[in-house]
């Protein structure tokens, strides 16, 4: 029984000799950063965006709580978010949040949505919410933030 429990606990970490997760970024997609209309910013640096998604910045100006919504596992948006913003593999992302919650630096990991449509609906409804969307499929009713002064259509946009 103990061996089974240990195997189950260690399985997500990868066994010795197994290949690590690779960050695979889908070609051609550009991530747009979308937020609730009341979020008091229009432009973030990539460093500020990382702090938000890593849980190091938990409030917008005026004490509005940041609510991070991440795409579903396996989606193109999630793959690009992990590679460009988190700079982590799926496994590293999970371990990061387990450790952060264990150290009581966060109450929980970002909320994972079941679909990008649900993410858009929640961003519209939840004050302080921030998420991502394929820049070619921006949902109506959300605020699109610029990153490093650039929109997703601009040359040199960092999230492609």
Q: What are these model-derived regions, one by one?
A:
Residues 20-160:
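Exported/periplasmic ABC-transporter solute-binding proteins
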Residues 3-12:
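Sec-dependent N-terminal signal peptides
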Residues 1-3, 140:
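Generic structural signal for short, solvent-exposed loop/turn connectors between secondary structure elements
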Residues 13-17:
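C-terminal segment of classical bacterial N-terminal signal peptides
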């Amino acid at each position: 029984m103990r061996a089974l429990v240990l195997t189950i606990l260690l399985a997500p970490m990868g066994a010795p000799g197994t290949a690590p997760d690779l960050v695979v970024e889908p070609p051609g997609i550009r991530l747009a950063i979308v937020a609730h209309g009341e979020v008091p910013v229009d432009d973030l640096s990539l460093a500020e965006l990382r702090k938000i998604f890593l849980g190091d910045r938990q409030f917008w100006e005026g004490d509005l709580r940041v609510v991070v919504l991440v795409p579903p596992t396996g989606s193109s948006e999630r793959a690009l978010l992990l590679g460009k913003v988190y700079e982590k593999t799926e496994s590293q992302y999970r371990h990061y949040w387990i450790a952060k919650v264990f150290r009581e630096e966060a109450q929980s990991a970002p909320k994972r949505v079941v679909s990008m449509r649900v993410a858009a609906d929640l961003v519209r409804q939840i004050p302080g919410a921030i998420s991502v969307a394929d820049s070619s499929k921006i949902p109506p009713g959300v605020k699109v933030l610029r990153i490093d002064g650039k929109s997703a259509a601009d040359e040199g946009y960092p999230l492609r």
